[in-house]
Design a protein with these regions (language model features):
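Active-site neighborhoods of metal-dependent hydrolases
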Residues: 1, 7-28, 75-79, 83-215
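Hydrophobic, small-residue-rich alpha-helical packing segments that form membrane-like cores
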Residues: 1-80
């Protein structure tokens, strides 16, 4: 409670100093670990000042809580804090939710009709760009920062679990063939290659190649 009150104080001070609103990245660590009620507490300071709550929602497909659980969370934050809501980004990002665009947009429209000021942004291309950890790593493996993640990798059981869960993530999205490493300063020869190609070079599985790149 003490930490949350301090966060509210910092949020209020920043808004009063000219910040346009509050932004969260609930898809990413460490933002992912924030509870909904904690975000609402901060968003209340936004609502009091008629400013904007912008969120990279917790899940854009089927990685963790699911697309519609995530969208409804953003709506509930706006409803309970009385602030404007901006969704980043409006998309159905996993095969499991492909074809759900109408349902997604209808939920936004129904929310507007309810009186909640909600909108979203969308980029006009089929690829996305993010960190390898955000795209593939299970959230439990990131909770202690890079040092803890490396400890997990050094443990045989945890490494096996990581490989299994990353492999499962491939099956829910574009697959290892759909992920391209754009920048890798440790070995620039791997830049521009897919994880399938890199796994072939390393003579290992795509999930194991992912861990080696992170290390």
């Amino acid at each position: 409670a003490e930490e949350l009150n301090y966060m509210r104080k910092l949020t209020a001070e920043s808004l009063d100093a000219g910040a346009l609103g509050l932004s969260t990245g609930l898809f990413y660590a460490p933002g992912y670990y924030a509870r909904t009620d904690e975000v609402i507490a901060l968003a209340e300071e936004v609502g009091k000042r008629d400013k904007l709550y912008s969120t990279h929602q917790r899940d854009e497909g089927s990685r963790t809580v699911g697309l519609f659980v995530s969208l409804n969370e953003a709506i509930e934050i706006g409803r309970r804090s009385d602030c404007k809501v901006q969704i980043s980004h409006v998309k159905c990002a996993a095969q499991k939710v492909w074809g759900k665009s109408y349902e997604y947009l209808q939920l936004l429209e129904d929310t507007v009709q309810e009186g909640i000021d909600i909108a979203g942004d969308q980029y006009p291309y089929t690829a996305s760009s993010t960190a390898l950890t955000g795209a593939l790593f299970p959230r439990w493996s990131l909770s202690g920062g890079r040092e803890k993640t490396l400890e997990f990798m050094a443990d045989e059981d945890h490494r096996g679990r990581l490989v299994d869960e990353i492999t499962d993530t491939f099956s829910k999205g574009r697959g290892a063939e759909g992920i391209i490493i754009a920048r890798y300063v440790e070995d620039e020869s791997l830049e521009g290659k897919t994880l399938i190609e890199i796994a072939d070079i390393m003579n290992t599985s795509p999930a194991e190649a992912t861990l080696r790149i992170y290390q």
